Regions:
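Bacterial N-terminal signal peptides that target proteins for export
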Residues: 1-11
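Bacterial signal peptide processing site
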Residues: 23-26
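Thiol/selenol-based redox catalytic cores and closely related redox-interacting motifs
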Residues: 141-142, 146-228, 232
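N-terminal "domain-start" segment that seeds a small globular fold
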Residues: 35-69, 94, 101
Length: 251
């Protein structure tokens, strides 16, 4: 996955009703009318998701039909991904793994959903996502969603996240980790992480490369990293985000 370079815990004793955190500039995220604040990392704002998008039907890795509305009452950490990404998404999985562990340690797993929604609905079927989730050892509150191309497009248009299908370089045809077949295309996409409040509103976002802060990529995906992915792991760059940034946005 060759990325677009630009986009637009509840861990204390008390679960705060209003999420706060700390800002990255770019095209994804709230409109100017949202008047977001911009502390140290990420952008804090409050934006309702379109009612039409909130009821769009997705399918999770267990084959269950889901909607964003069905997650109301939960705090949701949302990001875009594809299971065949070799550069950024495996690192995102590493940070999500850290977040899941911190949420569990704080005893609030029942109140937090980690949600990855594909930008590659043609290949990321529920069956593939089931295997992907199992290989990651993802806990029950770490969900993977797919849907029709129209549903996926509507969600990411609402969130301001761009993606596009591109052909693979004929000389660099990577192998599908599940089927063992050479891949014929990739999906470029922006790398954005959102927090949705229990009211279903967007509350916070950040962007850039995941910084694992010395942590590891899940074993299942280590071997799938390409040269760019290994370089991103070693040196995420200035514009990056950590699991601590996200957990700070959940307090």
């Amino acid at each position: 996955m060759r990325r677009f370079r630009s986009v637009g815990l509840v861990l204390g004793v008390v679960l705060f009703a209003v999420l706060s955190a700390c800002s990255s500039s770019g095209t994804a995220g709230p409109p100017a009318a949202s008047s977001p604040t911009s502390p140290a990392t990420g952008t804090v704002f409050d934006k309702a998701i379109s009612p039409a998008v909130a009821v769009l039907p997705f399918v999770n890795q267990d084959g269950h039909t889901m909607t964003l509305d069905s997650l109301k009452g939960q705090t949701v950490v949302l990001t875009d991904f594809l299971s065949l990404c070799q550069e950024i998404c495996p690192l995102t999985a590493g940070n999500f793994e850290q977040i899941a562990e911190k949420v569990k340690a704080s005893g609030v797993s029942s109140k937090i959903t980690l949600l990855e929604v594909t930008v590659d609905p043609a290949r990321d079927t529920p069956a593939r996502l089931k295997v992907y989730s199992a290989n990651l050892g993802a806990p029950v509150n770490w969900q993977f969603w797919t849907g029709s191309p129209a549903t996926i497009a509507a969600l990411w248009a609402e969130m301001g996240v761009a993606y596009e299908k591109v052909g693979e370089d004929p000389g660099e045809r990577p192998i599908d980790w599940w089927t063992g077949k050479a891949l014929t295309y990739d999906v470029n996409h922006q790398d954005v992480v959102f927090v949705l409040g229990a009211d279903g509103h967007e509350k916070w976002l950040t962007q850039g490369n995941p910084n694992l802060q010395g942590g590891s990529v899940p074993a299942f995906l280590v071997a799938y990293l390409n040269a760019n992915g290994r370089a991103n792991l070693a040196s995420p760059g200035v514009q990056s985000w950590t699991s601590n940034d996200v957990t700070a946005a959940l307090t």
